[in-house]
UniProtKB/Swiss-Prot annotation:
UniProt cross-references to Gene3D superfamilies, sorted A to Z: Catalase core domain
Keyword Heme appears in the UniProt entry: yes
GO biological process, one term: response to hydrogen peroxide
GO MF annotation list: catalase activity; heme binding; metal ion binding
PROSITE patterns in the record: CATALASE_1, CATALASE_2, CATALASE_3
Family statement: Belongs to the catalase family.
Protein name, entry field: Catalase easC
Enzyme active site: 58
Binding residue positions for heme: 347
Annotated function: Catalase; part of the gene cluster that mediates the biosynthesis of fungal ergot alkaloid. DmaW catalyzes the first step of ergot alkaloid biosynthesis by condensing dimethylallyl diphosphate (DMAP) and tryptophan to form 4-dimethylallyl-L-tryptophan. The second step is catalyzed by the methyltransferase easF that methylates 4-dimethylallyl-L-tryptophan in the presence of S-adenosyl-L-methionine, resulting in the formation of 4-dimethylallyl-L-abrine.
Enzyme's top EC category: oxidoreductase
Cofactor: heme
InterPro entries assigned: Catalase, Catalase_AS, Catalase_clade1/3, Catalase_core, Catalase_haem_BS, Catalase_sf
Biological source species: Arthroderma otae (strain ATCC MYA-4605 / CBS 113480) (Microsporum canis)
Length: 482
């Protein structure tokens, strides 16, 4: 019997256009009329284009799938379909990230951490784009590029240079509150599974009659805080992906991380009585810790997020993920927070650059829905009628919130907690030139005389030691991350 012709043929692979290719692991020689190896040329051109630009911010990250379950009835304040009905479940995908540095940088850098969740609701995608702190460095979106650049690599040396950050902070005192928190143990990275995240911005939850409440929602890790007495002993300094590996391996073995969803609520008529602008993202809504003298705005738990499945293709399922705070569903509207308004433009615009104009057709985004995505009408009456704000200029509250955070730490956490924050501050400040250090001390004087003294004394001791030729403290500027 004649052998089957197919048995003599090499294994065939499909090219990009679904055409069979006989020898995908070898190149055809040049024929008398020129090269004809279309597959090799196609493979090379695809290789040259297979990567996409990294994110402008939050470039380093990882992700996983999960589900959200409603655990409490909040129908008295909320008309979002996904949140109506105890026990109702919604599938989602989550991405964790650092903020300022590039892909390949360490999970453990002392900067903001992101936790973005895309809920695949019956009415379309709803994105929670959150950070591990409930407030931010700036309230004026025009300052955002400078703020991010100040936390990146020095454009001359390509090294990390804390002086760039301190130059920004001393010129923009609204960043002091965030800077103190970032240098405390709250800014110490441990694992993604212990990261709590906060939407930060005020949103509106709108009822069917058109009334609304201002809300802050956040996800509190059920595993506790993202630090252990300031210790990072379990973190391998030689493994920049320690948190990424920890999350993946935990889900693989069935140790699913969970978060409790909480919401704080403010009635618009109560906003003028609170003593600060609730739309200023450099301030937080007091949960009962600080500032003293301001009303506590309690939180209500209403749901549980569980991550229970790892991705199979990181590039397609995580790198091509696109989040935006503008991805809302009926019953949710943005507030008038200027940073939020700017982000609602900047995120989709960044995605059009990074992923192309057809990024909404990516498989991770293909969610069928029979509901229109346009929101209800915007309301003419809003908070600006009762609260005026100059978003660019310093206010006394910029120093007050930072001052009260510093002063409450021994009671709220411990004296050692406060001491470690001060140590992190002066180690960072010490790397700057004398004129910048002086400006930092003067800025801290406006927060707390004691804080300024402690930072000055600690930094100048390090500077004096570094001046010694044989000092082990000597280092090139920019070698230590903030």
């Amino acid at each position: 019997m004649a052998p089957n012709a197919a048995d003599k043929c090499p294994v065939m692979n499909n090219a990009a256009e679904k055409c069979p290719v006989m020898h995908s692991n070898g190149v055809s020689s040049i024929q008398s009329h020129g090269p004809r190896d279309i597959y090799t040329l196609e493979a090379l051109s695809h290789f040259n284009r297979e990567k996409i630009p990294e994110r402008a911010v939050h470039a380093k990250g990882t992700g996983a799938y999960g589900e959200f379950e409603v655990t409490a009835d909040i129908s008295d304040i909320c008309n979002v379909d996904m949140l109506l009905g105890v026990g109702k479940k919604t599938q989602c995908v989550t991405r964790f990230s650092t903020t300022g540095l590039e892909r390949g940088s360490s999970d453990g850098v002392r900067d903001l951490k992101g936790m973005a969740v895309k809920f695949f609701t019956e009415q379309g995608d709803w994105d929670w784009v959150s950070l591990n702190f409930p407030f931010f460095f700036i309230r004026d979106p025009a300052k955002f590029p400078d703020m991010i650049h100040s936390q990146r690599r020095d454009p001359q040396t390509n090294l990390l240079n804390p002086s760039m950050t301190w130059d920004f902070v001393t010129k923009n005192p609204e960043a002091l509150h965030m800077t103190l928190l970032q240098h405390s143990d709250f800014g110490t990275m441990f694992t993604w599974r212990t990261l709590s995240s906060y939407a930060g911005h005020a949103f509106k939850w709108v009822m069917p009659d058109g009334s609304f409440k201002y809300v802050h929602f956040f996800l509190a890790s059920d595993r506790g805080p993202n630090f252990t007495d300031g210790s990072t002993a379990k973190i391998d300094p030689n493994d920049p992906d320690f948190a990424t590996k920890d999350l993946f391996e935990a889900i693989e073995r069935g140790d699913y991380p969970t978060w409790t969803a909480n919401v704080q609520v403010i009635d618009p008529k109560d906003a003028p009585k609170l003593g600060f602008n609730i739309l200023d993202i450099t301030k937080h809504w007091n949960l009962g810790t600080y500032p003293k003298g301001l009303d506590t705005i309690p939180s209500r738990p209403f749901g549980k997020l569980t991550l229970n499945r790892n991705v199979k293709d990181y590039f397609t399922e995580v790198e091509k993920l696109a989040f935006s705070p503008s991805n809302l569903v009926p019953g949710v509207e943005p507030s008038e927070d200027p940073i939020l308004q700017a982000r609602m433009f900047a995120y989709p615009d960044a995605q059009r650059y990074r992923l192309g104009i057809d990024h909404l057709k990516a498989p991770i985004r293909r969610k069928e829905t029979s509901c229109k995505h346009d929101l209800g009408p915007e309301f003419d009456q809003w908070l600006s009628q009762v609260t005026s704000e100059s978003w660019s200029h310093p206010h006394e509250d910029d120093y007050k919130f930072a001052r009260e955070y510093y002063e409450v730490l021994p009671e709220f956490r411990s004296q050692e907690f406060q001491d470690r924050m001060v140590e992190n501050l002066y180690k960072s400040v010490a790397q700057g030139p004398e004129d910048l250090r002086k400006r930092v001390y003067e800025t801290f004087e406006l927060v707390s005389t004691e804080l300024a003294r402690r930072v000055r004394e600690g930094a100048e001791v390090i500077v004096a030691d570094m001046a010694q030729p044989d000092s082990p403290e000597r280092a090139q500027p920019g070698q230590q991350r903030l």
